[in-house]
UniProtKB/Swiss-Prot annotation:
The keyword Transmembrane does not apply. The gene is Stat3. Involved in the gp130-mediated signaling pathway. This is Signal transducer and activator of transcription 3. A motif (Essential for nuclear import) lies at residues 150-162. Forms a homodimer or a heterodimer with a related family member (at least STAT1). Component of a promoter-binding complex composed of STAT3, NFATC3 and NFATC4; complex formation is enhanced by calcineurin. Interacts with IL31RA, NCOA1, PELP1, SIPAR, SOCS7, STATIP1 and TMF1. Interacts with IL23R in presence of IL23. Interacts (via SH2 domain) with NLK. Interacts with ARL2BP; the interaction is enhanced by LIF and JAK1 expression. Interacts with KPNA4 and KPNA5; KPNA4 may be the primary mediator of nuclear import. Belongs to the transcription factor STAT family. The modification N-acetylalanine is found at residue 2. PANTHER family: SIGNAL TRANSDUCER AND ACTIVATOR OF TRANSCRIPTION. Keywords: Acetylation, Activator, Cytoplasm, DNA-binding, Nucleus, Phosphoprotein, SH2 domain, Transcription, Transcription regulation. The keyword Magnesium does not apply. It comes from the Eukaryota. It comes from Rattus norvegicus (Rat). The modification Phosphotyrosine is found at residues 640, 705.
Length: 770
């Protein structure tokens, strides 16, 4: 079954997560219209190779045209309009950068796959997530639902008792007024009053019973409000707080957060019970106005009960107003909470009290740094204005599940310029990527005679003015959400807390697993720990400061740990994603470990790792060979950077890599990917067939051009090569190489520079693939 069809069959909570994957950058309508074709394309490869991305993008436009023709035949005007609008948008945004749309689609398909896996795992385990505390959480939720059922039952029981009290009071009131009128007549007639005294005793008994019933109801109401307080505290201080913490974790690459539907059902149920209870308390006031007496419990306790239920409902409504989707720029979906001035960002708020009567009644207003103006001025922080559509009415139509929400899709920030054209205080202690700002959402609720001011805010955001600030800004978001669940601490970086390696390691692994199919292994994390903390045996519990993580240069390097790692993450996502997902890239490995595992392998065995010295991110391969004396040698080629990988895929570099000896014979030193995977098996599928690169020439045309093929070649030194039986198939013939073919000394660490050659084929080969 197609992936899109499988997704349509998921539960509502998963469908809501699916809805959050899509935005204007890649509309869900397009995913729906072209589902089979979209799933048949290799978007990951397109995301790493511009020529293929261009081809796929133009094919996408062609598929849109075909689908438009179908809608035209069906006279489906609405779909025609939507599809035309989508095509115009895609052309305007991605025509010059097709790799961008390829990356977006590849990520969406990957997230869809993860969603299906999560749902399948939950189904196999009876609905429990694959987490050690899943059973405990489920038990807590079951207890919470039982408490909610108990509250609802007690409310209904009170409803019945209120009717009994009302009937009893009506009887008392009728008898009292009847007796009073009869008593007046008897006084006029001078009749015997013995009957009157007997009826008075009956009225006193009725009043006693009425008083007992009233006291019972008042007592039960007090107990019910206490039960509501307990349930509400569990909902807001535990369940909702847990959801908000999981949202923080999801924002920095952790496991996807569960949707809010179940929590919304619980909160709505409690709110309905509270409103019904408030009506019951109002009913007590009506009963009191009809019949009251000395020591009346309603007179004594009703005002307090009214105050308690109103406070409960107000607080519940305020807690139920949440930011469902944190601010995020659509072009950077994997890095929320970082906003660039002048660039649109989106966000979504939701009220977890699903009352139909509130549909289209709540107008949301957005502002930034509402309560921190004085603090911002004191710290010298920048100030911003929110532009775009900064007000919106909440409704139930925009969400798939009918939740009461408002999604802001067209917001931008503009900095308020000071008189000196810069920051308010040039002596500010924080750099701009450490400034934290809050986006606030406000509205007013008028419901059943109550006016409630609602306010919620985003997690702290970092505002940048240049995309080159993104790495440090994202580091700030990681550090903040890793170490605190305080949602409003905008002064966090005036004295940033210290993290432990265990915390940092988990977050670093998330940076890979959230955007690829593979996180970091223990061995890879250990290598990173060495980079941060130096050699050690056990890094668990070791402390890492904010400065060491992001601001201080690594030992012997001119850049920080985070700048180096972030560029590697970018390299993986844009250029070697497919190879990383396959597990072919060992990536982070110390040179000592590299030598240890390769030295026992046969010549031609190689591994792929990231450069430790390239600030911009580089990837290289290291192989084992034997020199003329039979001694094992470990060699590394000079790392390939993004600029080089933009011209040729890493898989094609590996498949075509050669060394050139002094006699100009080309030999491939790469045979087996560690531990023993044949090179062709691992990388062949990621290289485009040469028949596609060079379409056959027209037999009737003029003499065909010679085909060419780009390969990377490392020249070797010429010393001692005469004694070698130079054969491309004999790896034992490989010798110690240098940086050039003029007898230069080998480079330090055995690194080779590679040259890219454009090899002309003979005319005999011109019409046949190599």
């Amino acid at each position: 079954m197609a992936q899109w069809n499988q997704l349509q069959q998921l539960d509502t909570r998963y469908l809501e997560q699916l809805h959050q994957l899509y935005s204007d950058s890649f509309p869900m309508e397009l995913r729906q219209f072209l589902a089979p074709w979209i799933e048949s394309q290799d978007w990951a490869y397109a995301a790493s190779k511009e020529s293929h991305a261009t081809l796929v993008f133009h094919n996408l436009l062609g598929e849109i045209d075909q689908q438009y023709s179908r809608f035209l035949q069906e006279s489906n005007v609405l779909y025609q309009h939507n599809l035309r609008r989508i095509k115009q948008f895609l052309q305007s945004r991605y025509l010059e950068k097709p790799m961008e749309i390829a990356r977006i689609v590849a990520r969406c398909l990957w997230e869809e796959s993860r969603l299906l896996q999560t749902a399948a795992t939950a189904a196999q385990q009876g609905g429990q997530a694959n987490h050690p505390t899943a059973a405990v959480v489920t038990e807590k939720q079951q207890m919470l639902e039982q408490h909610l059922q108990d509250v609802r039952k007690r409310v209904q029981d009170l409803e019945q008792k209120m009717k009994v009290v009302e009937n009893l009071q009506d009887d008392f009131d009728f008898n009292y007024k009847t007796l009073k009128s009869q008593g007046d007549m008897q006084d006029l007639n001078g009749n015997n009053q013995s009957v009157t005294r007997q009826k008075m005793q009956q009225l006193e008994q009725m009043l006693t019973a009425l008083d007992q019933m009233r006291r019972s109801i008042v007592s039960e109401l007090a107990g019910l409000l206490s039960a509501m307080e307990y349930v509400q505290k569990t909902l807001t201080d535990e369940e909702l707080a847990d959801w908000k913490r999981r949202q923080q974790i999801a924002c920095i690459g952790g496991p996807p957060n569960i949707c809010l539907d179940r929590l919304e059902n619980w909160i709505t149920s409690l709110a309905e019970s509270q409103l019904q209870t408030r009506q019951q308390i109002k009913k007590l006031e009506e009963l009191q106005q009809k019949v009251s007496y000395k020591g009346d419990p309603i007179v004594q306790h009703r005002p307090m009960l009214e105050e308690r239920i109103v406070d409960l409902f107000r607080n519940l409504m305020k807690s139920a107003f949440v930011v469902e989707r944190q601010p995020c720029m659509p072009m950077h979906p994997d890095r929320p909470l970082v906003i660039k001035t002048g660039v649109q960002f989106t966000t979504k708020v939701r009220l977890l009290v699903k009352f139909p009567e509130l549909n289209y009644q709540l107008k949301i207003k957005v502002c930034i740094d509402k309560d921190s103006g004085d603090v911002a001025a004191l710290r010298g922080s920048r100030k911003f204005n929110i532009l775009g559509t900064n007000t919106k009415v909440m409704n139930m139509e925009e969400s798939n599940n009918g939740s009461l929400s408002a999604e802001f899709k067209h917001l931008t920030l503009r900095e308020q310029r000071c008189g000196n054209g810069g920051r308010a205080n040039c002596d500010a202690s924080l750099i701009v990527t450490e400034e934290l700002h809050l986006i606030t959402f406000e509205t007013e609720v008028y419901h059943q005679g109550l006016k409630i001011d609602l306010e919620t805010h985003s997690l702290p955001v970092v505002v940048i003015s240049n995309i080159c600030q993104m790495p440090n800004a994202w580091a700030s978001i990681l550090w903040y959400n890793m170490l605190t669940n305080n949602p409003k601490n905008v002064n966090f970086f005036t004295k940033p807390p210290i993290g432990t390696w265990d915390q940092v390691a988990e977050v670093l692994s998330w940076q890979f697993s959230s955007t690829t199919k593979r996180g970091l292994s223990i061995e890879q994390l250990t290598t990173l720990a060495e980079k941060l903390l130096g050699p050690g045996v056990n890094y668990s519990g070791c402390q890492i400061t904010w400065a060491k993580f992001c601001k201080e240069n690594m030992a012997g390097k001119g850049f920080s740990f985070w700048v180096w790692l972030d560029n590697i993450i970018d390299l993986v996502k844009k250029y070697i994603l497919a190879l990383w997902n396959e597990g072919y890239i060992m990536g982070f490995i110390s040179k000592e470990r590299e030598r240890a595992i390769l030295s026992t392998k046969p010549p031609g065995t190689f591994l792929l790792r990231f450069s430790e010295s390239s600030k911009e991110g580089g990837v290289t391969f290291t192989w084992v060979e034997k020199d003329i004396s039979g001694k094992t040698q470990i060699q590394s080629v000079e790392p390939y950077t993004k600029q080089q990988l933009n011209n040729m895929s890493f898989a094609e570099i590996i498949m075509g890599y050669k060394i050139m000896d002094a006699t100009n014979i080309l030999v491939s030193p790469l045979v087996y990917l560690y531990p023993d995977i044949p090179k062709e098996e691992a990388f062949g599928k990621y290289c485009r067939p040469e028949s596609q690169e060079h379409p056959e020439a027209d037999p009737g045309s003029a003499a065909p051009y010679l085909k060419t093929k780009f390969i990377c070649v490392t020249p070797t030194t010429c010393s001692n090569t005469i004694d070698l039986p130079m054969s491309p198939r004999t790896l034992d013939s490989l010798m110690q190489f240098g940086n050039n073919g003029e007898g230069a000394e080998p480079s330090a660490g055995g690194q080779f520079e590679s040259l890219t050659f454009d090899m002309d084929l003979t005319s005999e080969c011109a019409t046949s693939p190599m």
